[in-house]
Amino acid sequence: LRTRVLMDAGELGSRNLSVTWIELPSGAEQTLRSDEEAEQAYVVVRGVGSMSVAGDTQQVAEGDLILVPPATEHAIANNGDAELACVSVQSPPVAAAELYSDQLAEVAGYDDEDL
């Protein structure tokens, strides 16, 4: 799992959004998580996988948008053969360090410097 903050609150004139790029190699998955206040939208940019939202798991592919309401457990997984990439938008903003601090990159080819 690799993440990169594309825009944080206060950048580019934004006050209420943060935008994060997420890459998951084949077989990787996020730790199940939720945020009490933030609404979140994922847009799959490439690859295929599955997204679990409030216990309901659906297959996702390039071009799909997934909405996650506040206080809702969710996770995305790459069950395809190629890398899965998506953009995540949160409002109110959530710091990427808070989102991913509990998940280490324990996938072949990734190390702590990639986070």
Where are these regions (language model features)?
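A generic "binding-loop/recognition-motif" signal
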Residues: A28, E37-A38, D56, T72-E73, ...
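Hydrophobic/aromatic beta-strand elements that line small-molecule binding cavities or substrate pockets
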Residues: T20-I22, D64, H74
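Double-stranded beta-helix
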Residues: A75-L115
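Short, charged/polar surface micro-motifs in flexible loops or helix N-caps
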Residues: L12-R15, L24-E29, V48-S50, T57, ...
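A short glycine-rich, His/Asp/Glu-containing loop-to-beta-strand
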Residues: L1-L32, A38
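Short, conserved beta-strand element in jelly-roll/cupin
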Residues: W21-P25, S34-V53, V89
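Short beta-strand His + acidic residue motifs that chelate non-heme Fe in jelly-roll/DSBH
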Residues: T31-L32, M51-S52, V68, H74-G80
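Short acidic-glycine-tyrosine-enriched beta hairpin
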Residues: A41, G55-P70
